């Protein structure tokens, strides 16, 4: 288990790239492509620690390559593979799923090994035919089927659709006990340690990855866990981050517990998208992340591959529906839309968005049909006319939060009304100041009215803020992010409070009509605030329905030394 090779290249545009090869078991080599400086992986991930793209080579009597890598590693990766083995002798390329960060070099491998057989789910093979635009030998596999490489390497395939692509399969080697999982159980974390020895260093990234990619498909996670429960797993060979070996039972147990908690909710939102069309899947995942922040369950389903009965059952169960427009020329997707229209019921929540594929089903006629059937629009249609910017992605996440909050409004009202216990009344006597948190990350700005704020340390100077998991600003308050804590003045807070407490439409400018000036990091400072401090988030603690955000304070200023901070007096402790 020693690093055999390590090659590096640096590029001003993409940062430092490293390829590391490690023998992880008998006749099995990991090819880890380390992307040290990547700072962003869609809106879900503001990366603190880069990421990796992991590929694997199994040398039995026959040879199999499990996944490839991101196209940015083309030169390094192909040189490493050629150094390990003559590519023309590779018999099989197993494609766990067709997301470009793992299948980006499939076409290059085909050029080096034209007789190779590509192994994957039926949907994956179909997607690849549209990606590589050349004929290739293929083998479609289903759950429970095996591929014998010889020398004891019997590979068993496990179907895991919607984790987080519809074509996902897992691969288990019965000789080595290695389960190849691609995105499942992964994390965006880049370092030169092959395995998960440092549990606490990667724990937060593991949870964040689950929340963003796997949580929206909790039911599918549970189904996959059920299928692998009888496998004697010694190593989980993930597609991103360190391989899991030291703490396997803990990681898998957390996936199960998180998914059980997510799946047991009574409120379900069905998210329909068209795989491999426009930005459909990308935007729906972001929107689904916004939904799950409010405590509702979500289920993603591909309009191009789902069976009519599957669509009908999901629509019947769901309290809300979100549809990313498929191509108007896809007969399968059109049939799925007709099934949805026939299965919806009165007062379901509905949200529609374009996919930006150039041939989208027109959104407004479909919107009218749903309204005629008595469905309630959760957010205005989201129109996509160009490649989604950060602001568009923020709009989608906030739209997801909106539909989730609308569906859980009765639960929230019930909680507010349950104020009979002495404990809640006593807790409500804890008074705090009034503040507005403002932040900016790239093109995105956010703001939040807050009262659960306190100084938390003297050396270094630090503050702690409780942020509800369903707040829109939560995605902008990750470790390493910056924000401004604006302190409101006792006799001059009503206008700002009224403005920032109002309900904003998804993507709306929180600062329209408000005078601000930029902090050091660009976050807005409110001109009418009594005082402000510029803060950097250094840790987050999971506290039930809130995050406790601890931040160090770097800059501060008081506008009026004679004024007092506005104070928030409550009588009950079960709501703000």
Curated annotation (Swiss-Prot):
Single GO molecular function: FMN binding
Bound cofactor: record note: Binds 2 iron ions per subunit.
UniProt entry tagged with the keyword Cell cycle: no
UniProt keyword list: Electron transport, Iron, Metal-binding, Oxidoreductase, Transport
InterPro entries: Flavin_Rdtase-like_dom, Flavodoxin/NO_synth, Flavoprotein-like_sf, Metallo-B-lactamas, NADH_oxidoreductase_modular, ODP_dom, RibonucZ/Hydroxyglut_hydro, Split_barrel_FMN-bd
EC number in record: 1.-.-.-
Cofactor(s) listed: Fe cation
Region (Flavodoxin-reductase-like): 432-576
Annotated binding of Fe cation 1, by residue: 97, 99, 164, 183
Keyword Transferase attributed: no
Enzyme class, spelled out: oxidoreductase
Family: In the N-terminal section; belongs to the zinc metallo-hydrolase group 3 family.
Binding site for Fe cation 2: 101, 183, 240
UniProt domain Flavodoxin-like: residue ranges: 269-431
Function of the protein: Mediates electron transfer from NADH to oxygen, reducing it to water. This modular protein has 3 redox cofactors, in other organisms the same activity requires 2 or 3 proteins.
Additional note from the record: By homology with NorV in E.coli, could be involved in nitric oxide detoxification.
Lineage: Bacteria, Bacillati, Cyanobacteriota, Cyanophyceae, Nostocales
Protein known as: Putative diflavin flavoprotein A 1
Region (Zinc metallo-hydrolase): 48-240
């Amino acid at each position: 288990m020693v690093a055999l090779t390590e090659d590096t290249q640096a590029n001003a545009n993409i940062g430092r790239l490293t390829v590391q090869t490690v023998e992880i078991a008998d006749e099995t080599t990991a090819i880890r492509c380390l992307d040290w400086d990547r700072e962003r992986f869609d809106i879900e991930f503001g990366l603190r620690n880069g990421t990796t793209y992991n590929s694997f080579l199994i040398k039995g009597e026959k040879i199999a390559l499990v996944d490839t890598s991101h196209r940015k590693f083309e030169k390094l990766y192909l040189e490493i593979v050629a150094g390990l083995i003559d590519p023309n002798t590779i018999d099989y390329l197993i494609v766990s799923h067709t997301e470009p960060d793992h299948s980006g070099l499939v076409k290059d491998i085909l050029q080096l090994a034209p007789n190779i057989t590509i192994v994957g789910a039926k949907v994956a093979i179909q997607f690849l035919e549209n990606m590589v635009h050349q004929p290739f030998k293929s083998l479609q596999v289903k759950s429970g089927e095996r591929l014998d490489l010889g020398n004891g390497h019997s590979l068993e395939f496990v179907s895991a659709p919607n984790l987080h692509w519809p074509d996902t399969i897992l691969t288990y080697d019965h000789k080595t006990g290695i389960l190849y999982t691609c995105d499942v159980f992964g994390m965006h974390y880049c370092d030169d340690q092959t395995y998960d020895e440092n549990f606490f260093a990667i724990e937060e990234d593991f949870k964040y990855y689950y929340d963003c990619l796997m949580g929206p498909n909790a039911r599918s996670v549970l189904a996959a866990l059920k299928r692998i429960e009888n496998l004697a797993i010694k190593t989980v060979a993930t597609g991103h981050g360190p391989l899991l070996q030291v703490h396997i039972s803990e990681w898998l147990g957390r996936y199960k517990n998180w998914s059980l908690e997510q799946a047991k909710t009574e409120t379900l939102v069905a998210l329909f998208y068209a795989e491999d069309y426009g930005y459909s899947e990308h935007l729906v995942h972001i929107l689904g992340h916004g939904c799950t922040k409010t405590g509702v369950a979500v289920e993603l389903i591909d309009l191009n591959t789902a069976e009519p009965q599957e669509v009908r059952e999901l629509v019947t169960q769901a309290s809300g529906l979100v549809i990313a427009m498929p191509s108007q020329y896809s007969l399968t997707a059109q049939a799925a839309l007709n099934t949805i229209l026939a299965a919806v019921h009165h007062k379901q929540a509905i949200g529609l968005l374009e996919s930006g594929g150039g041939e989208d089903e027109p959104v407004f006629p479909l919107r009218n049909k749903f309204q005629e059937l008595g469905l309630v629009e959760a957010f205005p249609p989201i129109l996509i006319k160009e490649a989604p910017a950060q602001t568009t992605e923020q709009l989608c996440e906030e739209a997801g939060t909106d539909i989730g909050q609308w569906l859980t409004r009765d639960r929230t009202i019930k909680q507010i009304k349950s104020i009979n216990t002495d404990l809640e009344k006593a807790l409500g006597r804890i008074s705090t100041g009034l503040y507005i948190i403002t932040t900016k990350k790239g093109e995105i700005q956010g703001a939040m009215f807050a009262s659960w704020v306190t100084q938390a340390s003297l050396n270094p100077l630090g503050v702690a803020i409780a942020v509800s998991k369903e707040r829109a600003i939560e995605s902008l308050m990750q470790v390493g992010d910056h924000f401004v804590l604006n302190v409101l003045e006792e006799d001059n807070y009503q206008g700002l409070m009224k403005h920032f407490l109002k309900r904003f439409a998804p993507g709306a400018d929180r600062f329209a009509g408000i005078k601000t000036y930029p902090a050091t990091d660009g976050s807005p400072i409110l001109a009418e605030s009594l005082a402000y401090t510029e803060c950097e988030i250094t840790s987050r603690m999971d506290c039930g329905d809130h995050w406790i955000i601890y931040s160090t304070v770097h800059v501060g200023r008081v506008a009026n030394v004679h004024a007092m901070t506005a104070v928030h007096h409550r009588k009950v402790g079960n709501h703000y």
